[in-house]
């Protein structure tokens, strides 16, 4: 009643034909590039989730006025001289 048709090219190949089927250099390069992009995307996702879970750990603990010597923090007299 119902016949099953396989349109996949690898399903019709014999075992020795499958071993002979190889990716071209362009396909290998494309797969390597996509793989590197996926690894980079994964690292960015992990970094973003770490920042979302603990946002204050990535901020520096010093403030802008730590480097001032002899002046009070919050005064802008040093900018006028």
Swiss-Prot record:
Keywords attached to this entry: Membrane, Transmembrane, Transmembrane helix
Topology of this chain in the membrane: Single-pass membrane protein
UniProt key word Membrane: yes
Bilayer-spanning residue ranges: 29-49
Pfam families in the record: Cortexin (PF11057)
Cellular localisation: Membrane
Cellular compartments per GO CC: membrane
Entry keyword Transmembrane: yes
Entry's family note: Belongs to the cortexin family.
Protein name: Cortexin-2
Source organism per UniProt: Danio rerio (Zebrafish)
Protein encoded by which gene: ctxn2
């Amino acid at each position: 009643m119902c016949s099953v048709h396989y349109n996949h090219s690898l399903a019709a190949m014999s075992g020795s034909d499958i071993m002979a089927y190889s990716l071209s250099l362009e396909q290998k390069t494309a797969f390597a590039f996509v793989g590197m992009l996926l690894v980079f995307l994964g690292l960015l996702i992990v970094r973003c989730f770490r920042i979302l879970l603990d946002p204050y750990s990535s901020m520096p603990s010093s403030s802008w006025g730590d480097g001032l010597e002899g002046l009070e923090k919050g005064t802008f007299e040093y900018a006028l001289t």
